[in-house]
Amino acid sequence: MGTQEGWCLLLCLALSGAAETKPHPAEGQWRAVDVVLDCFLAKDGAHRGALASSEDRARASLVLKQVPVLDDGSLEDFTDFQGGTLAQDDPPIIFEASVDLVQIPQAEALLHADCSGKEVTCEISRYFLQMTETTVKTAAWFMANMQVSGGGPSISLVMKTPRVTKNEALWHPTLNLPLSPQGTVRTAVEFQVMTQTQSLSFLLGSSASLDCGFSMAPGLDLISVEWRLQHKGRGQLVYSWTAGQGQAVRKGATLEPAQLGMARDASLTLPGLTIQDEGTYICQITTSLYRAQQIIQLNIQASPKVRLSLANEALLPTLICDIAGYYPLDVVVTWTREELGGSPAQVSGASFSSLRQSVAGTYSISSSLTAEPGSAGATYTCQVTHISLEEPLGASTQVVPPERRTALGVIFASSLFLLALMFLGLQRRQAPTGLGLLQAERWETTSCADTQSSHLHEDRTARVSQPS
């Protein structure tokens, strides 16, 4: 078993033992511990900017000395790194890195990665400065890139060796650098750039925040912050900040300048995400001496909408399942059939339409299936599985046999006929009543007119009979 595995086993035992024997305190305390990582050292001949191949790298270990981490009581039996514990027939190159000048906020993720079932990928390479030859000869610089698997953080460190002199007793044969009495290469971390997660997924139209933080040694000045997007072989500038001035190339992109100086936070916010925002984002921080970057993958997702319809009422009806508005492209469509009292069974034979893409970039497709209702009818379900869905999305419909459809048609037609008869009968019942009211009204009008005529005749008669 390797040294790093042994250290991890001891740490895991200490964590589990502490958890069983004593309760966790209500509030944790900070404790400085040594974080030991298995790494690879890229040889000087390796191509810069790319991961070195197995032939171009050597085994190495990185010891981050006395890193403050939050202790909940589980680190009581944890011991710091001892140089003699790594003595082997073929010992790795050991880099001791002091973190007194910077902060390592994700040190806990590095410390507990193995015990959490995650892996830490660590590669160390030479870091070259654009400086005078005299300055370069007095020291050496290295960059360590560490990534925690499973969506964990990613950290890049720039390490500087002490001033190189020829009076050192121990000397590394290949690095041409002095060694400590324990046989390690001593360095100090002067600059770090990190992100909390290396990959993010957001829904179409939502707002995304891409995390990017940094820490630098006293005496260094922040020169610029640059966010770039790489997608399908094309690169473009998204946001830049230089000398206190920010410029958003992508509409709506924001970076809080106040956070740069106070919290060393260079996170980028992107509102109203579109398909064009998907890709690999590069956060590059430049100081007066160093430059480092982090890479974040942004994935855009759109959930599908499912609609199931019956295309025709033929002897063997056709079902059409429309899946619309989803992204990315990969989608799985399954059909199931369930008879009354039975269990769902997957059916085959479905066909698919050509793929359609909207102006927004989302996809749509239709799946068709010839249904076999059987003697008692059956329920068909179209089920869609997509990365944007926590669980499959489905739509169901019941298909009845032809004879039941005929019976239902007869019942429906009979119902319409009865309703029509009832409506006509109701109209006929209301018609005489209305006619009687009209006749009564006419009779009253006639009677009133006759009465008035009679009174007028009597009045005229009376006037004629009076003597002159």
UniProtKB/Swiss-Prot annotation:
Keywords: Cell membrane, Disulfide bond, Endoplasmic reticulum, Golgi apparatus, Immunity, Immunoglobulin domain, Membrane, Microsome, Repeat, Signal, Transmembrane, Transmembrane helix. Changing R228E: Loss of MR1 expression at the cell surface. Disulfide bonds join C212-C283, C321-C382. It is found in: Cell membrane; Endoplasmic reticulum membrane; Microsome membrane; Golgi apparatus membrane. Residues 181-297 form the Ig-like V-type domain. GO terms for biological process: negative regulation of antigen processing and presentation of peptide antigen via MHC class I; peptide antigen assembly with MHC class I protein complex. One of its GO terms (cellular component) is MHC class I peptide loading complex. The chain crosses the membrane at residues 406-426. InterPro entries: Ig-like_dom (IPR007110), Ig-like_dom_sf (IPR036179), Ig-like_fold (IPR013783), Ig/MHC_CS (IPR003006), Ig_C1-set (IPR003597), Ig_sub (IPR003599), Ig_V-set (IPR013106), Immune_Resp_Modulators (IPR050380). Gene3D superfamilies: Immunoglobulins. The keyword Mitochondrion does not apply. CDD domains: IgC1_Tapasin_R. Residues 427-468 are cytoplasmic. PANTHER family: TAPASIN. Component of the antigen processing and presentation pathway, which binds to MHC class I coupled with beta2-microglobulin/B2M. Association between TAPBPR and MHC class I occurs in the absence of a functional peptide-loading complex (PLC). This is Tapasin-related protein. It comes from Homo sapiens.
